[in-house]
Amino acid sequence: MKKIRVICVDDSALVRGLMTEIINSHPDMEVVATAPDPLVARELIKQHNPDVLTLDVEMPRMDGLDFLEKLMRLRPMPVVMVSSLTERGGEITMRALELGAIDFVTKPRLGIRDGLLDYSELIADKIRAASRARLRGPAPVAAAALPARLRSPLNSSEKLVILGASTGGTEAIREVLLPLPPDSPAILITQHMPAGFTRSFAQRLDTLCAVTVREATHGERVLPGHVYLAPGGEQHMKLGRSGANYVIELEAGEPVNRHRPSVDVLFHSAAQAAGRNAIGVLLTGMGKDGAAGLLAMKRAGAYTLAQDEASCVVFGMPREAILLGAADEVVPLPAMSERILMRAGDRGHRV
């Protein structure tokens, strides 16, 4: 079996050693070299031609972002960022994903060694996903490069969009939200992310989009023109009802499909609370989280969309949904916003 060849770039010798130990403990991958900074890494990449690079976000001698930007321009390859759990770390990580990094893993703040060893399976999963990922170019940043804003059909506040994503999802979500007008239907999103990063992600999207994007809070009313992002790591997000209103419910619970928040938990709750007033959307991601939930939504009368293989970074979750017969339609990412708004224009049903 051909192993996934990995180079680890981190200024901490401790982290380099731990990453090597973790990666080499999995039979399908190996560390072929490590580097303390991007300048050393540049030579090692030429020498070893790795399948995946793990890259520390904040490093001396050359900033991780500068290096990533040059790498994606000159020699694109799958990169998994290793990030500290700080606000600055969160902002830098969001920018790294925009520049083309496939995914990221957090560095635990305390007891680095124990934390990283606990993360062994997660790190291995992310490296496997990265090795199979379809590379994207950097996201456009100039205002001129932003897509034309779509016009909203007449909406009822009963209609809402329920969306799930994982690997590659941050940029896919950005692409879906950017063209939406300010009077779009409410959107609830579960994107697999650790605690501490969803706030940075929501703030980043809020500055770019016409809709209001924020991290969801328990008990808040769901309003049109708003996007609610499930907080990372600690709780599941559900859609509930309070009288005639939809509300956000955040609740503790065991991980589902190894994820918390889980897309399936959100989708199953939407099937129950919104029925045919919901539009279910499943975007790029590894694994099967969301597939069964999308089927439940479809059976409850929702219209369901899955991202097509050609536009996915990792065609895992949408593929599982399609195999289950859970998707009414398979849609390329660039057409997704328009399809959502077209379906949202259908009349809402009072529940």
Swiss-Prot record:
The lineage of its organism: Bacteria, Pseudomonadati, Pseudomonadota, Betaproteobacteria, Burkholderiales. The modification 4-aspartylphosphate is found at residue 56. Residues 154-341 form the CheB-type methylesterase domain. Contains a C-terminal catalytic domain, and an N-terminal region which modulates catalytic activity. It is found in: Cytoplasm. Phosphorylated by CheA. Phosphorylation of the N-terminal regulatory domain activates the methylesterase activity. Keywords: Chemotaxis, Cytoplasm, Hydrolase, Phosphoprotein. One of its GO terms (molecular function) is protein-glutamine glutaminase activity. Involved in chemotaxis. Part of a chemotaxis signal transduction system that modulates chemotaxis in response to various stimuli. Catalyzes the demethylation of specific methylglutamate residues introduced into the chemoreceptors (methyl-accepting chemotaxis proteins or MCP) by CheR. Also mediates the irreversible deamidation of specific glutamine residues to glutamic acid. This is Protein-glutamate methylesterase/protein-glutamine glutaminase 2. Pfam families: CheB_methylest, Response_reg. Residues 5-122 form the Response regulatory domain. GO terms for cellular component: cytoplasm. The keyword Cytoplasm applies. The active site is at 166, 192, 289. Signal peptide: none annotated. Its EC number is 3.1.1.61, 3.5.1.44. It comes from the Bacteria. Belongs to the CheB family. It catalyses: [protein]-L-glutamate 5-O-methyl ester + H2O = L-glutamyl-[protein] + methanol + H(+); L-glutaminyl-[protein] + H2O = L-glutamyl-[protein] + NH4(+). It comes from Bordetella avium (strain 197N). Its main location: cytoplasm. One of its GO terms (biological process) is chemotaxis.
